[in-house]
Amino acid sequence: PFDPTEIKNYHNELIAKLAQKVDRDMPGSDRLIALAYRNGQYPLVTLMLKNAKENGLTAWVRAKMALRAGDVNAAAAWYAKAAASFPPNETWGFQSYSDDIVGEEFVTPVCRIHAEQAILALNRDDYLQAMRLMYQAKENYWPDVAHIAERVLTVNELLAFVDKYVPAPSPSAPTTPKNAGRDSADARLRNLLARRL
């Protein structure tokens, strides 16, 4: 099915069938928990997390559930565990357009987690930490990095950040078809800083 309502109904039926085994952990239960969370079945998520083995995905869902419960400190701790659990080069492929995402997004779990951590830091008014976290997700979330760099940080904060975290440009790297016509996030951030100065 390609209709969003049909897909959600299919997911709900699948979750209901598989959730009959929530009294114990089973292979793939972390994915079932994530699917239940995504479909808004939060009581089921809470129930399933009681028996789930800890891994990056369950830590990530626990972070989201802690945010739903208003426990920002617990959410931050779970996000840290989740971020440490995924290899930086793990990818899950494309996520199609939805109400939350405009266009396709190439899902890299650690990038997504860092971006969510950055939003949490922004809500705590910890702007430099937000920039550090969002910068770790720079290739996937460049518009968010640019927004923080341009609209949130002061010029001096941005200058200090670039000096500390952004590698100096390499001397005229040859243009290859892979990177032709597009500067790296590092180069774009340096250009943004130059414009602000």
Positions of the model-derived regions?
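Alpha-helical solenoid repeat scaffolds
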Residues: 1-197
